[in-house]
Amino acid sequence: LTFTLFFCFSSIWAEDGSALWLRYASGAKAEITSKKQSPTLRIAVSELQNFWQGGIPVTLEVRNNKELRALGNEGYTIQTSKGGNQITIASSGEQGVLYGTYHLLRLQATGQLPESALQSLNISERPDYRIRILNHWDNLDGTIERGYAGHSLWKWDELPSVVSPRYEAYARANASIGINATVINNVNASPKILSNDYLQK
């Protein structure tokens, strides 16, 4: 009984919630290719290399054809080749490739990719809204108006010399669900946020 209780409490302690819904298991040295290189595409490649477990190689493509242009820069397709031996995530924009990457990983994480589905993926997505915002009510002193979960994420006194790893985790979580904009300050923010120093931050 003592051992059981210890194990349960240890498991609870290990989960701090910071991974949010991005609790992917490690991948299996997945084969991921992208002809084009950019910071955004490197993130997509890294996510798949670290977490893709489907066993089928994945190719990332930025293409400028009629079908993809109709989906916009943030829309994408996820398709399995006719032979079933390759998955292609394609978009007319790099952002669309990243969103498609998270879509594929989400299907995997939620158990929606049995072998039969892997062989016949044919997904096409187009955002209904061009701007998808996460809105904050944070003040420059770290307090949050109507905030009930601690202090602000933003460490203004440390920026720009110290960039917290939490900012990357925050951006990753947003990208994984298609959020492409953020309001980082309260609507009644201090006018200091428009000063040169704060614009630099």
Predicted features along the sequence, with ranges:
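Sec-dependent signal peptide recognition
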Residues: 1-4
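Acidic helix-start/capping segments at beta-turn-to-alpha-helix junctions
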Residues: 56-68, 120-123
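N-terminal signal peptide c-region/cleavage motif recognized by signal peptidases
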Residues: 9-11
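Short hydrophobic beta-strand segments
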Residues: 16-42, 57-63, 89
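Single, functionally critical "micro-switch" positions that shape active/binding sites
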Residues: 13-14, 92
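Residues at alpha-helix termini
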Residues: 54-56, 177
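Feature activates predominantly on carbohydrate-active enzymes
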Residues: 39, 44-47, 71-77, 81-201
